Protein backbone atom coordinates (compact mmCIF):
# COMPACT_ATOMS: atom_id res chain seq x y z
CA UNK A 1 0.00 0.00 0.00
CA UNK A 2 1.38 3.40 -1.00
CA UNK A 3 -0.45 5.84 1.26
CA UNK A 4 0.25 9.51 0.78
CA UNK A 5 1.99 11.19 3.73
CA UNK A 6 -0.15 13.55 5.79
CA UNK A 7 -0.23 17.14 4.61
CA UNK A 8 2.11 19.70 6.15
CA UNK A 9 0.91 23.10 7.31
CA UNK A 10 2.31 26.24 5.71
CA UNK A 11 1.92 29.87 6.75
CA UNK A 12 0.85 32.24 3.99
CA UNK A 13 1.64 35.94 4.37
CA UNK A 14 -0.18 38.32 2.05
CA UNK A 15 2.04 41.27 1.11
CA UNK A 16 2.14 44.21 -1.22
CA UNK A 17 -0.03 46.99 -2.56
CA UNK A 18 -2.82 46.97 -5.10
CA UNK A 19 -1.76 48.06 -8.59
CA UNK A 20 -2.21 51.83 -8.90
CA UNK A 21 -3.60 51.33 -12.42
CA UNK A 22 -6.41 49.01 -11.24
CA UNK A 23 -9.84 50.50 -10.69
CA UNK A 24 -11.63 50.07 -7.38
CA UNK A 25 -14.20 47.96 -9.25
CA UNK A 26 -11.47 45.63 -10.55
CA UNK A 27 -9.97 45.32 -7.09
CA UNK A 28 -13.38 44.61 -5.54
CA UNK A 29 -14.02 41.88 -8.14
CA UNK A 30 -10.64 40.34 -7.24
CA UNK A 31 -11.48 40.52 -3.53
CA UNK A 32 -14.89 38.91 -4.11
CA UNK A 33 -13.27 36.18 -6.23
CA UNK A 34 -10.66 35.67 -3.52
CA UNK A 35 -13.31 34.97 -0.87
CA UNK A 36 -15.06 32.46 -3.16
CA UNK A 37 -11.71 30.77 -3.89
CA UNK A 38 -10.65 30.87 -0.23
CA UNK A 39 -13.94 29.37 1.03
CA UNK A 40 -13.63 26.58 -1.54
CA UNK A 41 -10.08 25.86 -0.39
CA UNK A 42 -11.19 25.82 3.27
CA UNK A 43 -14.16 23.55 2.47
CA UNK A 44 -11.81 21.24 0.55
CA UNK A 45 -9.41 20.98 3.49
CA UNK A 46 -6.58 22.76 1.65
CA UNK A 47 -6.66 25.93 3.74
CA UNK A 48 -7.32 27.06 7.25
CA UNK A 49 -8.62 30.53 7.93
CA UNK A 50 -6.37 33.33 9.04
CA UNK A 51 -7.15 37.02 9.14
CA UNK A 52 -6.56 40.40 7.62
CA UNK A 53 -4.36 42.61 9.75
CA UNK A 54 -5.29 46.04 11.03
CA UNK A 55 -3.14 48.95 9.88
CA UNK A 56 -1.75 49.96 13.29
CA UNK A 57 0.78 47.90 15.20
CA UNK A 58 3.88 48.04 17.40
CA UNK A 59 7.47 46.84 17.08
CA UNK A 60 8.66 45.21 20.30
CA UNK A 61 12.37 44.58 20.94
CA UNK A 62 14.91 44.78 23.73
CA UNK A 63 15.17 48.48 22.95
CA UNK A 64 11.50 48.92 23.82
CA UNK A 65 8.25 49.42 21.98
CA UNK A 66 7.82 51.75 19.02
CA UNK A 67 4.93 52.50 16.71
CA UNK A 68 4.72 50.63 13.44
CA UNK A 69 4.39 49.06 10.95
CA UNK A 70 4.84 51.88 8.50
CA UNK A 71 2.71 52.17 5.37
CA UNK A 72 5.66 53.41 3.33
CA UNK A 73 7.27 49.97 3.68
CA UNK A 74 7.91 48.39 0.29
CA UNK A 75 5.65 45.42 0.95
CA UNK A 76 3.06 45.86 3.66
CA UNK A 77 1.79 42.69 5.34
CA UNK A 78 -1.97 42.67 4.88
CA UNK A 79 -2.94 39.32 6.35
CA UNK A 80 -2.17 35.65 6.84
CA UNK A 81 -3.72 32.21 6.60
CA UNK A 82 -2.64 28.59 6.43
CA UNK A 83 -2.33 26.06 3.59
CA UNK A 84 -2.30 22.28 3.91
CA UNK A 85 -0.06 20.68 1.26
CA UNK A 86 2.33 17.77 0.75
CA UNK A 87 5.22 20.00 -0.36
CA UNK A 88 6.25 23.63 -0.64
CA UNK A 89 5.80 23.30 -4.40
CA UNK A 90 2.21 22.08 -3.99
CA UNK A 91 1.49 24.94 -1.58
CA UNK A 92 2.87 27.44 -4.11
CA UNK A 93 0.74 25.94 -6.90
CA UNK A 94 -2.38 26.26 -4.76
CA UNK A 95 -1.55 29.88 -3.94
CA UNK A 96 -0.86 30.73 -7.57
CA UNK A 97 -4.65 30.48 -8.05
CA UNK A 98 -5.27 33.46 -5.72
CA UNK A 99 -7.27 36.01 -7.78
CA UNK A 100 -5.66 38.96 -5.96
CA UNK A 101 -2.22 38.19 -7.38
CA UNK A 102 -3.33 39.64 -10.73
CA UNK A 103 -3.64 43.05 -9.06
CA UNK A 104 -0.29 43.36 -7.33
CA UNK A 105 -0.52 41.37 -4.11
CA UNK A 106 2.12 38.74 -3.34
CA UNK A 107 1.88 35.62 -1.18
CA UNK A 108 4.87 34.43 0.81
CA UNK A 109 4.57 30.79 1.88
CA UNK A 110 6.68 29.15 4.59
CA UNK A 111 6.50 25.70 6.12
CA UNK A 112 5.70 25.70 9.83
CA UNK A 113 8.41 24.05 11.92
CA UNK A 114 6.81 21.71 14.46
CA UNK A 115 9.96 21.54 16.60
CA UNK A 116 10.79 23.66 19.61
CA UNK A 117 13.49 26.26 18.98
CA UNK A 118 17.05 25.12 19.74
CA UNK A 119 20.10 27.43 19.55
CA UNK A 120 22.24 24.48 18.40
CA UNK A 121 20.00 23.46 15.49
CA UNK A 122 20.28 25.31 12.19
CA UNK A 123 17.03 27.26 11.75
CA UNK A 124 15.85 30.57 10.33
CA UNK A 125 16.81 32.43 13.52
CA UNK A 126 20.00 30.52 14.43
CA UNK A 127 22.92 32.88 15.11
CA UNK A 128 25.74 32.76 12.57
CA UNK A 129 28.68 30.53 13.51
CA UNK A 130 31.41 32.41 15.35
Walk through the language-model features, giving the residues of each.
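Conserved, structured core segments of small domains
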Residues: 1-130
Amino acid sequence: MNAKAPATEYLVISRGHWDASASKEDIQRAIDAFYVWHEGMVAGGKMRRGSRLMKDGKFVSRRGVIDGPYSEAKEVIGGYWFVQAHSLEEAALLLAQNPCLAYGLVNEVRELDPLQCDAFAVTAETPAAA
